[in-house]
Amino acid sequence: MATKAVLLPWLIPSPRHVSLFPVVQLPALETAGWCVRKRRAEDVAVSVAFNPSGNFDISAFENDQDSDKVEPPMPPTTGRYEVVIDNDSIGRLDLSPFQRAIGITSPDDFGVAEPKRYLDRTIGFTINYKREDPGDPRELSEYPDVRLWFVRLDAMYPWLPLLLDWRAGELARYAAMLVPHQMSLRMGVVFNPEALELFVMNKVFVVYPWLKRHGVPKPRLKTSDMARMLGFGIGDELFDLIDHNE
């Protein structure tokens, strides 16, 4: 039986969701080269379910005919920074395609760059990944080498989720590269809820101080919006604690 994850005191389910589980829309799989096979757009969603025995409980959702259908994704933001990677850059853990696309070479470069420019234009990814076996049905987030590239990217630029093209689903796809999950033909990506909670909290602790450090207006709101995109709400008590202990 699927159970709701135990949330931290400051981490509450987003009020926009009526389900017991946080649900996040993934964009159509054919968008931006993130997929290796197509599915119907209405079948693609991110849902959180977890079985205490240690297995993801996907079966609880497969036959739920009353579950909400996921709306088609919005198109990519016009003029966004587009990061194009392929097998070569992935295999060498080469981050230069990202650095060239957005015009920085190290995290320290943001000390002189204007974060608002990246927040306005946003960042997206196109993954040109050629499979050894054309019949391999796995999604890109299920390939270890692809995920490892994103793990390194996230380690170098931990505030990156804030700058992604949220409306086109880039944040949900990015999370799928870093958070344990399984694939469901009906539900799409099914996250481990505890891992998703930790991912969200980690990003809150990174993003909120980063926004304040760069003088970006309304850092609490922007941080909360990021968490809400993944199905969680952040209480002011947590921001107060961060501010008090800086």
UniProtKB/Swiss-Prot annotation:
Q: Name one GO cellular component term.
A: chloroplast thylakoid membrane
Does the UniProt entry include the keyword Plastid?
yes
Q: Where in the cell is it found?
A: Plastid, Chloroplast stroma
UniProt keywords, alphabetically:
Chaperone, Chloroplast, Plastid, Transit peptide
**Keyword flag ATP-binding:** no
Q: Please give the knockout or disruption phenotype noted for this protein.
A: Impaired chloroplastic NAD(P)H dehydrogenase (NDH) activity, probably due to a reduced stability of the NDH complex.
Principal localization reads plastid
Read off the transit peptide span from the entry.
1-59
Top-rank taxon of the source lineage equals Eukaryota
**GO biological process per UniProt:** NAD(P)H dehydrogenase complex assembly
A Pfam family hit = Crr6
Q: Tell me, in a sentence or two, what this protein's role is.
A: Required for both formation and activity of the chloroplast NAD(P)H dehydrogenase (NDH) complex of the photosynthetic electron transport chain. May function in assembly or stabilization of the NDH complex. Required for the accumulation of NDH subcomplex A, which is a core part of NDH. May be involved in post-translational steps during the biogenesis of subcomplex A.
- Quote the protein name from its UniProt record: Protein CHLORORESPIRATORY REDUCTION 6, chloroplastic
The major lineage groups are: Eukaryota, Viridiplantae, Streptophyta, Embryophyta, Tracheophyta
